[in-house]
């Protein structure tokens, strides 16, 4: 009789993380594990194994044998923002500059997970600031979006966190952030509205106090 592999046996017998190619490209993830990462991954694998059983699946069938490992690895990637400090990223790329007009990086691709259902939401972020003696490397604005996105989120908080990190480090005359995203928790379940888009904004400084500055930003992101 074939012995069923229990969640604890997954940890004992699983392959190292250099692992197999499942054909979807997930084997290209960063597979370097610390001891703590390994323990976390083992716990995630056991949880996924149990979930598969609870939804009525057989975790031992061929197509699911490596699913706990793959899901655990995916979760490590999708939540890696918990282990990064966005303000430190900004601090590393600050430059003194007299430029005092708007700096806008628009259409930054964004992928995150709703903390209520752990389903993805994705879309675009538009980030602008008006310098006050300091500018930052443009890629760091996109990196700030990425770090906060790679956490369990609600879009409203995500928008504010991006604004606040930039405001805290650069101390500019103002920051503006708009996020437009589609939430799969509204598409795959619940109201099942396929074409719904959620838009959130967070402003500070002159983007709050000057209607013309705010209006310029909103016009630019709609082009």
Swiss-Prot record:
Any one GO biological process: tetrahydrofolate biosynthetic process
- What start-end ranges are recorded for coiled-coil regions in this protein? none
Q: Where does Zn(2+) bind?
A: 114, 117, 185
Q: Which InterPro entries does this one have?
A: GTP-CH-I_C/QueF, GTP-CH-I_N, GTP_CycHdrlase_I, GTP_CycHdrlase_I_CS, GTP_CycHdrlase_I_dom
Listed under catalytic activity are: GTP + H2O = 7,8-dihydroneopterin 3'-triphosphate + formate + H(+)
Source organism: Chlorobium chlorochromatii (strain CaD3)
Name this polypeptide is given: GTP cyclohydrolase 1
In what pathway does it function? Cofactor biosynthesis; 7,8-dihydroneopterin triphosphate biosynthesis; 7,8-dihydroneopterin triphosphate from GTP: step 1/1
Pfam families per the record? GTP_cyclohydroI
Supply the PANTHER family for this chain.
GTP CYCLOHYDROLASE 1 (PTHR11109:SF7), GTP CYCLOHYDROLASE I (PTHR11109)
Q: SUPFAM superfamilies under this entry?
A: Tetrahydrobiopterin biosynthesis enzymes-like (SSF55620)
**Keyword terms of this UniProt record:** GTP-binding, Hydrolase, Metal-binding, Nucleotide-binding, One-carbon metabolism, Zinc
Q: Kindly state the subunit structure of this protein.
A: Homomer.
Q: Which family does it belong to?
A: Belongs to the GTP cyclohydrolase I family.
Which EC number applies?
A: 3.5.4.16
Q: Which PROSITE patterns match?
A: GTP_CYCLOHYDROL_1_1 (PS00859), GTP_CYCLOHYDROL_1_2 (PS00860)
Tell me the GO molecular function terms.
GTP binding; GTP cyclohydrolase I activity; zinc ion binding
Q: Name one GO cellular component term.
A: cytoplasm
Q: Gene behind this chain?
A: folE
């Amino acid at each position: 009789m074939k012995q069923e592999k229990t969640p604890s046996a997954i940890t004992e017998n699983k392959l190292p993380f250099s692992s197999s190619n499942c054909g979807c490209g997930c084997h290209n993830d960063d597979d370097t594990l610390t001891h703590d990462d390994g323990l976390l991954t083992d716990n995630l694998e056991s949880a996924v194994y149990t979930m598969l059983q609870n939804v009525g699946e057989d975790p031992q069938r061929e197509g699911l044998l490596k699913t706990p490992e793959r899901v655990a690895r995916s979760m490590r990637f999708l939540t890696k923002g918990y282990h990064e400090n966005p303000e430190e990223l900004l601090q590393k790329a600050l430059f003194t500059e007299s430029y005092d007009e708007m700096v806008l990086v628009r259409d930054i691709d964004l992928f995150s997970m709703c903390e209520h259902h752990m389903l993805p939401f994705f879309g675009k972020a538009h980030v602008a600031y008006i310098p006050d003696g300091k500018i930052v490397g443009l890629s760091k604005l996109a990196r700030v979006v990425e770090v906060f996105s790679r956490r369990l989120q609600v879009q409203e908080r995500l928008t504010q966190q991006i604004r606040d990190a930039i405001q805290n480090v650069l101390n500019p005359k103002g920051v503006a952030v708009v996020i437009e995203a589609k939430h799969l928790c509204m598409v795959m379940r619940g109201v099942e509205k396929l074409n719904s888009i959620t838009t959130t904004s967070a402003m500070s400084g002159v983007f709050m106090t000057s209607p013309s500055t705010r209006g310029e930003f909103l016009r630019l992101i709609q082009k």
